[in-house]
């Protein structure tokens, strides 16, 4: 088999890239290791209105669980501060599949239960993918491979672009979807508590009036096996009990890369996108907004390369130039703050924030909560 573009991974980044390429007339194949797209869910499901607008997606009631108008910062003292934020909380299992359907309607093909094993190389150039399907091992050739295969990215690693993750490069996360009756359906909340949540924070993202995603993320250097879920249980039973009382109907645990993007997200015949490229905010762990926008850019650059018959690294570098223009400042600022946090006395930081008379105005002008949402 041979295609113009092979996309490995049917998450939002890969699906948007495939959609863009197929829409422009490219022959596209999506390889997805799961039997069902969109499960298990991997995040708090928040997305900014700006991200959807940038990739040309109109909000659809079929996959929007809540429309957000405000962001709230909660401190251990009980103080809360809020700013206006425009965005949505999604039903990821519906949204992710919706994106793949759009790609298929544009002409892309999809193969499920296709486990990518490695990038196929010819004198250092990526020329396809080896994968294991239901009926054995196969090779598929491509003019461009878009690696959207997640945090460990076998394709990126075998292409020599993705280094091994260290423990402090990962934020370990645990999240419940809770059914209850104490949620403000128009506001998400970030709870900052360095004593209970070292190197991280907790969140509450409403999914309507009686459901919410309640989770916690802890930087890997501060974590240990099972700590994220244990911490979440303690928060739900303790300081957050008045806000998140209810019954869990789903639990998810996982990891998010918080080391910042890999040095090169392109090579001869290959582009990296989403978690595979580690295009995740190093401070907040937010990556859904960047996945959509970088996925769209990757698809567009793949089309340009095929039209120009030039899939060299020097041509594909324009992909990195474009997504860095969009996110460079945000990522650099986030990385600097994340690197500075371990050197701070976080108890003093909390005390300082609690004492600031005009903290809401400071949050509004600094854009901190918007950046958490923007991810």
UniProtKB/Swiss-Prot annotation:
GO terms for cellular component: membrane. SUPFAM superfamilies: FAD/NAD(P)-binding domain. Its EC number is 1.3.-.-. This is Digeranylgeranylglycerophospholipid reductase 1. InterPro entries: DGGGPL_reductase, FAD-bd, FAD/NAD-bd_sf, Geranylgeranyl_Rdtase_fam, Geranylgeranyl_reductase. One of its GO terms (biological process) is glycerophospholipid biosynthetic process. PANTHER family: DIGERANYLGERANYLGLYCEROPHOSPHOLIPID REDUCTASE, GERANYLGERANYL DIPHOSPHATE REDUCTASE. Gene3D superfamilies: D-Amino Acid Oxidase, subunit A, domain 2, FAD/NAD(P)-binding domain. It catalyses: a 2,3-bis-O-phytanyl-sn-glycerol 1-phospholipid + 8 A = a 2,3-bis-O-(geranylgeranyl)-sn-glycerol 1-phospholipid + 8 AH2; 2,3-bis-O-(phytanyl)-sn-glycerol 1-phosphate + 8 A = 2,3-bis-O-(geranylgeranyl)-sn-glycerol 1-phosphate + 8 AH2; CDP-2,3-bis-O-(geranylgeranyl)-sn-glycerol + 8 AH2 = CDP-2,3-bis-O-(phytanyl)-sn-glycerol + 8 A; archaetidylserine + 8 AH2 = 2,3-bis-O-phytanyl-sn-glycero-3-phospho-L-serine + 8 A. Keywords: FAD, Flavoprotein, Lipid biosynthesis, Lipid metabolism, Oxidoreductase, Phospholipid biosynthesis, Phospholipid metabolism. Is involved in the reduction of 2,3-digeranylgeranylglycerophospholipids (unsaturated archaeols) into 2,3-diphytanylglycerophospholipids (saturated archaeols) in the biosynthesis of archaeal membrane lipids. Catalyzes the formation of archaetidic acid (2,3-di-O-phytanyl-sn-glyceryl phosphate) from 2,3-di-O-geranylgeranylglyceryl phosphate (DGGGP) via the hydrogenation of each double bond of the isoprenoid chains. Belongs to the geranylgeranyl reductase family. DGGGPL reductase subfamily. Its cofactor is FAD. It holds the Pfam family FAD_binding_3. Binds 1 FAD per subunit. Pathway: Membrane lipid metabolism; glycerophospholipid metabolism. GO terms for molecular function: FAD binding; geranylgeranyl reductase activity; oxidoreductase activity, acting on the CH-CH group of donors, NAD or NADP as acceptor. Reduction reaction proceeds via syn addition of hydrogen for double bonds.
């Amino acid at each position: 088999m041979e295609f113009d573009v092979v996309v490995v991974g049917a998450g939002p980044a890969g699906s948007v890239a495939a959609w863009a390429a197929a829409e422009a007339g490219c022959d596209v194949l999506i390889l997805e290791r799961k039997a069902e797209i969109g499960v298990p869910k991997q995040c708090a499901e928040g997305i900014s209105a700006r991200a959807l607008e940038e990739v040309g997606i109109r909000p659809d009631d079929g996959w929007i669980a809540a429309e957000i108008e405000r962001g709230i910062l909660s401190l251990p003292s009980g103080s809360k501060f809020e700013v206006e934020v425009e965005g949505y909380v999604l039903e990821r299992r519906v949204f992710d599949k919706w994106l793949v359907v759009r790609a298929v309607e544009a002409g892309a093909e999809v193969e499920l239960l296709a486990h990518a094993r490695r990038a196929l190389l010819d004198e250092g150039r990526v020329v396809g993918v080896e994968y294991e399907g239901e009926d054995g091992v196969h090779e598929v050739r491509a003019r461009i491979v878009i690696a959207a295969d997640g945090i460990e990215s076998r394709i990126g690693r075998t292409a020599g672009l993705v280094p091994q993750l260290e423990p402090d490069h990962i934020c370990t996360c645990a999240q419940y979807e809770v059914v209850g009756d104490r949620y403000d359906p128009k506001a998400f909340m970030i709870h900052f508590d360095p004593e209970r949540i070292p190197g991280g924070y907790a969140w509450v993202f409403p999914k309507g009036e009686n459901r919410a995603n309640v989770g916690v993320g802890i930087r890997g250097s501060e974590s240990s096996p099972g700590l994220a879920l244990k911490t979440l249980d303690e928060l739900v039973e303790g300081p957050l009990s008045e806000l998140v009382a209810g019954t869990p109907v789903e639990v998810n645990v996982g990891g998010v890369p918080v080391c910042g993007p890999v040095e090169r997200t392109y090579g001869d015949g290959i582009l990296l996108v989403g978690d595979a490229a580690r295009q995740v905010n190093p401070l907040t762990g937010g990556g859904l907004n960047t996945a959509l926008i970088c996925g769209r850019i990757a698809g567009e650059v793949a089309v340009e390369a095929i039209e120009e018959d030039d899939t060299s690294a020097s041509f594909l570098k324009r992909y990195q130039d474009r997504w860095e223009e969009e996110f460079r400042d945000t990522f650099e600022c986030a990385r600097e703050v994340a690197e500075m946090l371990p050197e701070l006395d976080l108890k003093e930081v909390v005390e300082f924030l609690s004492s600031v008379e005009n903290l809401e105005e400071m949050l509004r002008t600094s854009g901190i909560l918007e950046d958490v949402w923007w991810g």
